């Protein structure tokens, strides 16, 4: 009888441990495969750009699709683009919100509303493509394929 109780306890512990491991794996896999998470990382890098420009640039550039990098690169040119009109309006943004407007198996489009550091309010369209990860060619991840220039609203906040 005592052996049976220990066996049941052992099986419960093994089952619980396997569930936790599965949930952790699933969560981390989802983190890598959700375009919303990538977009949040990128926008948070824009939000804190001045506090660590090199890290922010590495994050933003790291999630750029190879086609995007070909057009906007090399990285030094990409940085110059970020620091000049109209894209510098996104740097050090105060707040943002986004809505997914298009969703396909390999492409997601977001409408992003941004409150800039100067209190102007604008939106951009951000387009991701699910493609081969630059850091790990055996995996696919969401990469920025395009970002529109800011479209300003009539009045700020």
Predicted regions and their residues:
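Exposed beta-sheet edge and beta->alpha loop/turn motif
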Residues: 101-157
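Short, low-complexity N-terminal intrinsically disordered segments enriched in polar/charged residues
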Residues: 20-56
């Amino acid at each position: 009888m005592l052996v049976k109780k220990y066996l049941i306890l052992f099986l419960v512990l093994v089952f619980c441990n396997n569930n936790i491991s599965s949930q952790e794996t699933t969560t981390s896999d989802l983190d890598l495969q959700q375009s919303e998470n990538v977009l949040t990382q990128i926008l948070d890098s824009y939000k804190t750009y001045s506090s660590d420009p090199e890290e922010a640039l590495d994050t933003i550039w790291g999630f750029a699709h190879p086609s995007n990098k070909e057009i906007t690169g090399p990285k030094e040119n990409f940085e110059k683009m970020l620091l000049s009109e109209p894209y510098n309006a996104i740097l050090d943004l105060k707040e943002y919100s986004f809505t997914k407007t298009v969703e396909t198996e390999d492409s997601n489009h977001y409408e992003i509303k941004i409150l800039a550091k100067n209190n102007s309010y604008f939106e951009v369209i951000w387009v991701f493509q699910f493609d081969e990860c630059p850091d790990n060619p055996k995996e696919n991840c969401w990469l920025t394929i395009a970002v529109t220039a800011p479209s300003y609203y009539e009045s700020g906040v």
